[in-house]
Regions:
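Residue-level preference for the first positions of well-ordered beta-strands
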Residues: 92-94, 163-167, 202
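Soluble extracytoplasmic domains of inner/organellar membrane proteins
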Residues: 154-155, 162-164, 168-177, 181
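A membrane-cytosol interface segment of integral membrane proteins
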Residues: 137-163
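Soluble, non-transmembrane catalytic domains of enzymes that act on hydrophobic metabolites at membranes
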Residues: 1-18, 70, 77, 81-85, ...
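A cross-family acyltransferase "interaction/gating" segment
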Residues: 127-129, 143, 175-259
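Catalytic core of membrane glycerolipid acyltransferases/transacylases, capturing the structured
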Residues: 47-53, 57-63, 77, 93-145, ...
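A transmembrane-helix-recognition feature enriched in membrane-embedded lipid enzymes
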Residues: 14-83, 130-134, 240-242
Length: 286
């Protein structure tokens, strides 16, 4: 029997859904794109200047503010409103989230100051790769021999007082399901961190859900998976998008109450899946 999750493993040949776009929608999309490019080109020098002036002093607020407003403006250009439930932890933690599309980064970044973990392929994406590097993203390779190196890099980030956000599904989906969590990176919750010997980092599950508002948009409209074209997905979001992205910051999971990373990963997965199921059912009732 075919595994229904196989279509999210970046090897599907199924044709992706792409809505018909009117001339008006194409014009709107092009206008939004021009604003995005202009705003981004203005934001990059400001961000780099803030980085030069404040990076050595340990003051992060100017960079965080610039990054946050850039993300919020970009979300609004995509006609997405953001709704937040819960509170991002003020303690250093590992944030784990279900993954739906490239929009997740913008939504999370508009609220939380975190360092993202991304697959190494992302740094080669035109435009987006450069922006990811600028944000100090930790790029990881899917190579078992590199796990030790990547864990060490993440430990340094955590020991410097930065929370780390990663997507344990290992890929993105249609937003209507949560794929099986990979437990590898959860080991960071139990690792020793530098000279301070802080050996417990708590986990904050974060569930994300997109709710389209246009009646002609499918409920999986924002999902980007398999070998879908990144360009076409960005195009349809800019031209036709209208909806809400909901972020739910759940209570911290105390890592010292779990025996190992697999138990911790399983609990985080259950919390996020339950929240996603609730949101899907609620949106269908309306």
């Amino acid at each position: 029997m075919e595994n229904p999750d196989d279509r999210y493993l970046w090897k599907t040949d199924k044709e992706e859904f792409f809505p018909k776009l009117t001339v008006y929608e194409l014009a709107i999309g092009f206008f939004r794109f021009l604003i995005f490019v202009s705003y981004t080109l203005c934001s990059i020098p400001l961000f780099l200047l803030a980085k030069i002036l404040f990076n050595q002093t340990g003051i992060k607020k100017p960079m965080v503010i610039i990054r946050r407003y850039w993300s919020l403006v970009t979300l609004r250009l995509c006609s997405l409103k953001i709704k937040v439930k819960g509170t991002f932890s003020s303690e250093v933690c590992l944030v784990v989230c279900n993954h739906i599309s490239w929009l997740d980064i913008l939504a999370i970044q508009s609220i939380a100051d975190v360092v993202f973990v991304a697959k190494s392929d992302v740094k080669n994406w035109p435009g987006l790769g450069f922006l990811a590097k600028l944000a100090n993203t930790l790029f990881v390779e899917r190579n078992p021999q590199k796990i030790g190196l990547h864990s060490e890099q993440a430990n340094v980030i955590l020991s410097n007082g930065n929370s780390v956000c990663f997507f344990p599904e290992g890929t993105s989906s249609d937003g209507l399901r949560v794929l099986k969590f990979r437990s590898g990176f959860f080991q960071l919750a139990f690792n020793s961190l530098g000279e301070k010997k802080v050996n417990i980092i708590d986990i904050q599950p974060l569930s994300i859900f997109y709710e389209p508002k246009n009646s002609d948009m499918r409920i999986d409209f924002y999902g980007w998976w398999g070998n879908m074209s990144l360009f076409l997905h960005i195009l349809k979001v800019l031209c036709k998008s209208s909806g809400i992205v909901s972020l739910n910051f759940h209570k911290l999971l105390k890592s010292d109450r779990f025996q190992n990373r697999k138990q911790l990963a399983s609990k985080a997965e259950d919390i996020i899946r339950d929240e996603l199921t609730f949101n899907i059912e609620k949106s269908r009732i309306r």
